[in-house]
């Protein structure tokens, strides 16, 4: 029912504002919600378009094991990395005495005006090549459409990273936020 959909949207996004991209998508998906066992039939275009970047959680776990990493920091980005991101990764690695960092970029749908995944991929790889110690960073991506659910989505992102073998997640300013729906540091609390 509309009442149930609205209740779920309010709980997930903290708003029913139809201008919120997550609310808009969620409330326009229809009135049926399906649950049960999941079987992946297709990895969509991600594997074909990003053969050097897209990897499943199992593939990432395997590479982490092959590298011998025990303590692994994850950094998610939907933007090209810049100097502050580099410093965040370095600080987290140093503070935790981590073996490496997984830079995990979003390859799915983002909001209007965001930089295309292929450009982000090139930028991230160049930054890693030029500014990080060799073999300290794994660059990967995953096919997930941003929900823009703020703090709740940050928890979901942490579960994703835990499933792929990471022990820590860097949660930045306005993580999974959009507009003024969430405070800039709500996901860090």
Q: Model features per residue range: what roles?
A:
Residues 1-189:
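Active-site cores that bind ATP or allylic diphosphates and position pyrophosphate for catalysis
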């Amino acid at each position: 029912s509309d009442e149930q959909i609205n209740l779920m949207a309010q709980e997930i996004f903290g708003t029913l504002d139809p201008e919120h991209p997550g609310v808009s998508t969620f409330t326009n998906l229809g009135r049926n919600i399906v649950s049960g066992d999941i079987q992946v039939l297709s990895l969509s275009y991600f594997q074909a378009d990003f053969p050097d970047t897209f990897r499943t959680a199992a593939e990432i776990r395997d590479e982490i094991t092959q590298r011998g990493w025990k303590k692994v920091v994850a950094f998610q980005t939907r933007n090209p990395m810049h100097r502050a991101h580099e410093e965040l990764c370095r600080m987290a690695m140093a503070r935790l005495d981590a073996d490496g960092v997984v830079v995990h970029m979003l390859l799915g749908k983002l909001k209007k005006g965001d930089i295309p995944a292929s450009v982000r991929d090139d930028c991230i790889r160049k930054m890693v090549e030029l500014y990080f110690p060799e073999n300290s960073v794994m660059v990967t991506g995953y096919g997930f459409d941003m929900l823009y659910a703020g703090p709740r989505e940050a928890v979901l992102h942490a579960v994703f990273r835990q499933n792929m073998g990471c022990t820590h997640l860097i949660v930045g300013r306005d993580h999974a936020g959009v507009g003024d729906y969430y405070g800039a540091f709500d996901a860090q609390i």
